[in-house]
Amino acid sequence: MITVVVTFSIPSEVSASVLEEKFLETAPMYLETPGLVRKNYLYDRATLEAGGCYTFQDKKSAELWFNEERIAWITERYSAPDIRHFETPVIVDQDTGLIDNPGY
C-alpha cells in the first residue's frame, strides 16, 4: 500500500464552509479512482492549509493518479501542492479490528 499526503495553501478569504463545498464537489470522482482505497480531506484553519490523505493499493496507481495533469488541476483549483508518497507497511483498522501487513 502507498499513502500519499497532499497539502496546499488556502487563501484567508476562503471560509471553511466554502472549502467544504469544494471538497464535496470533487468527492464523487474518488469513488471511480483506480487503485484508491480511501481518501480523507484535510484542513487546518490555523495554518490555512488543506489537502488530502490518500491510500492506494500500489505505487503505480498513486503515480498514475498524481500525473502532471492532476497536479495542474490541483494548482488551478487551490494552489501549488506539496505531494509526499509513503510506503504503508502496516495498517490498523479500528472499524474492523484488524491489523493488515501489506509489507513493502
Task: Indicate where each model-derived feature is located.
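Short S/T/G/P-rich N-terminal loop/turn motif that feeds into the first structured element of a domain
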Residues: 1-49, 59-67, 84-104
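Conserved short beta-strand edge segments in small beta-sheet-based binding/regulatory domains
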Residues: 75-87
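RNA recognition motif
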Residues: 69-73
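A short, exposed loop/beta-hairpin motif centered on an aromatic-Gly-Thr core
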Residues: 51-54
